[in-house]
Amino acid sequence: MSKALLYDSTICIGCKQCEAGCAQQNNLRYDDSVAAESVQSEHKYTVVMTRGDKFMRRLCMHCEHPACASVCPVGALHKTKEGPVVYDVWKCIGCRYCMAACAFSQPKYEWASLNPRVRKCIMCPDRVAAGKQTACAEICPTGATKFGDRDDLIKEAQDRIRQNPSTYLNRIYGLNEVGGTCVLILSSGKVEDFGYPASAKIGDTPMPEYTGRVMERVPDFIPVWSLVLGGIYWISHRREEVAAAEAQERASDKKNGSVR
């Protein structure tokens, strides 16, 4: 059974503790300047957006059938049995197909880096595999972000809507969108007002089904071996670059006494 997050925007107070907890868990810089940013980026995997007196989190939706994983030619993205959609930097060749395929515009790219990587929320896979909550759910002071089994969270969301019909829209965003996601959202207003795509636009069909239809149209005469050999070179070269960049970064941090 997939694990999931239930985010209830009606009890979110906009404290941004989820942002801070995420940054700490993923060794990301989080200071006043980062906290003030209102959009996601390669160094901010989740963001709490504000519209008047309403708040809304944006993060990777961890689709049950992730389009990003289906288009990745080297398997750098995959969904774990527990639910998180995770990223393997050692496999990534920087093609950015995942960015184009994501219905929720979640993967971000380190454009300014000499050794760029794709970045997004990975739902704390090590914690989840160990039976723990995600960092954002654990740190949330109001329970606006709750972690648990997807089926249980769906039932709880339905109960909340039934018991408080004047508080919530009669809708669980993520229940069926693109085949269902492991981030479920309850709200009093339209999530589309915060940048989420309309359900009617993305539909209920899992995105990989469209990927398969496109791949079926790829001509057989494409020189597959040149792609394979080229891919092997890129993967090998990529790993060397990643290792060198990480070593340089660690040396710089040690020299400057900084903590990331």
Where on the chain are the PLM-derived regions?
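Non-ligating segments of multi-cofactor redox enzymes
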Residues: 1-260
